[in-house]
Amino acid sequence: MSSNLLPTLNSGGKVKDGSTKEDRPYKIFFRDLFLVKENEMAAKETEKFMNRNMKVYQKTTFSSRMKSHSYLSQLAFYPKRSGRSFEKFGPGPAPIPRLIEGSDTKRTVHEFINDQRDRFLLEYALSTKRNTIKKFEKDIAMRERQLKKAEKKLQDDALAFEEFLRENDQRSVDALKMAAQETINKLQMTAELKKASMEVQAVKSEIAKTEFLLREYMKYGFFLLQMSPKHWQIQQALKRAQASKSKANIILPKILAKLSLHSSNKEGILEESGRTAVLSEDASQGRDSQGKPSRSLTRTPEKKKSNLAESFGSEDSLEFLLDDEMDVDLEPALYFKEPEELLQVLRELEEQNLTLFQYSQDVDENLEEVNKREKVIQDKTNSNIEFLLEQEKMLKANCVREEEKAAELQLKSKLFSFGEFNSDAQEILIDSLSKKITQVYKVCIGDAEDDGLNPIQKLVKVESRLVELCDLIESIPKENVEAIERMKQKEWRQKFRDEKMKEKQRHQQERLKAALEKAVAQPKKKLGRRLVFHSKPPSGNKQQLPLVNETKTKSQEEEYFFT
């Protein structure tokens, strides 16, 4: 079956003997697989090219060309006339004489010529079919020979491939055996490693547990050592120093130095406690003077000193003994023989802690009171600074006004010197000037020192007061002055914004009022005929409506001058 099917599938292909290589035994390449298709495409292209150069009347349709080239179109004509088909007849020249059957006995020359043409076409078609059949038979024989050669070659290749597969299977079996042996060895090694690692982990866990217990016991031992009296601790330290003679020259100086440091620290803390007690007494006295209820302290400074001295003796006992250079391998010694002794020491320490807590609370309360007083003083100073700045601005404005008045007076004096001097007017001006000077003096200094001073002396005092205020302003920190200026600017901007909003609201109310009046007013009825524009007489009196800006300026001037 394969030998019969392959020629039909690979028709038109030619295979050369020995063209395939030995490394590709399963591939057969056909050279002329698409040769018929390529020839048809080339024929179509040439036919298109020829049709482009032909005239219109020279061109033919596809159906006409097929009729002229095919004899089947001629065969389809006769069954329609006679009602018969050529399928009844077998292959060969038998259908040719039967074409005449069913035709009329009387025929024209044209019909005879057509019949002869049809006969010729049928004979030609039969001959071409015979030739093509012979050609196909030759091709089939050649392809069968080629297929036999290919089958033989395939058998040889299959034998070689089977040999290769057998060798490959043998090698894979050997490799699998080696891999299995390696995996077994690896599993044994991993099992041994796991066992060793588990043993190591167990040892490490035991070491960690023992280290934890050792730390806990050392902590408890150091705690008991800390709770023991100081003289006993010094004795134990001396014993350890004597036991380790190599380290005696290093440990004893350190112990003495630490003891001296602890004593100095105790004295400093006692001094600080005395100072804080004095501060608390001052604060309580100050509160009593201000009218607030005074608070009595629970303990005197002497009691605090004694309690602090007792507490420091037990707190500092471990620091000079917990040195890195001390030996821990010595046999431990305990001062406490019974648990009740340790509990008694702990109770005493608890009482000392309570006293210290109460003392710290007292100190915190005193600090809060001091902070409150400081805040009150700061507020007072800030208010004084603001007041002084306002006074300075007022005095500067008064000085500017007085300078302007002095310039006016100087001009008037020059006019008086040219012969226009009037003693009455001069006296009136001097009286008004003295009144203004007294007003400025009262504003700047007050009414207390107004007795028996002439205007010049008052001006001198005002000037000295201004100098003092300028010095005070310079002594004030720049940050405070800038903060006050910012506050004043903020107040001025807020005031300006409020005035602007009030003006806007008033203007809106005026507009609403005008709109309401316009809505409520009765409409004007036009009487008579309306005049034309060019015949309207000019009005004699022109009414000018006040603008909004003018009303605003007038209202601002009225507020400035009359409020």
UniProtKB/Swiss-Prot annotation:
Compartments where found: Cytoplasm, Cytoskeleton, Microtubule organizing center, Centrosome; Cytoplasm, Perinuclear region; Cell projection, Cilium, Flagellum; Cytoplasm, Cytoskeleton
Q: Superkingdom of the source?
A: Eukaryota
Query: What ranges does the record list as Basic residues composition bias?
Result: 523-533
> What keyword terms does UniProt attach to this protein?
Cell projection, Cilium, Coiled coil, Cytoplasm, Cytoskeleton, Differentiation, Flagellum, Spermatogenesis
Enumerate composition-biased segments (Polar residues): 1-11, 282-299
Q: Which residues form a coiled coil?
A: 129-212, 384-415, 497-522
Cross-referenced Pfam families: DUF4200
Please give the residue ranges the record annotates as the region Disordered: 1-21, 272-311, 522-563
Which molecular-function annotation in GO is an example for this chain? ubiquitin-modified histone reader activity
Mind telling me which InterPro entries this protein's record contains?
Answer: CFAP_domain-containing, DUF4200
Specify whether Repressor is a keyword of the entry.
Answer: no
CC terms in the record's Gene Ontology section: centrosome; manchette; perinuclear region of cytoplasm; sperm flagellum; sperm head
GO BP annotation list: acrosome assembly; intraciliary anterograde transport; sperm flagellum assembly
Q: What does this protein do?
A: Essential for male fertility. Required for sperm flagellum biogenesis. Also required for acrosome biogenesis. Required for the attachment of developing acrosomes to the nucleus during spermiogenesis and may be involved in the transport of fibrous sheath components.
Q: How does the record describe its quaternary structure?
A: Interacts with CCDC42, CFAP53, IFT88 and ODF2. Interacts with CCDC146. Interacts with TEKT3. Interacts with ubiquitinated histone H2A.
Write the protein's name.
Coiled-coil domain-containing protein 38
Species assigned in the record: Homo sapiens (Human)
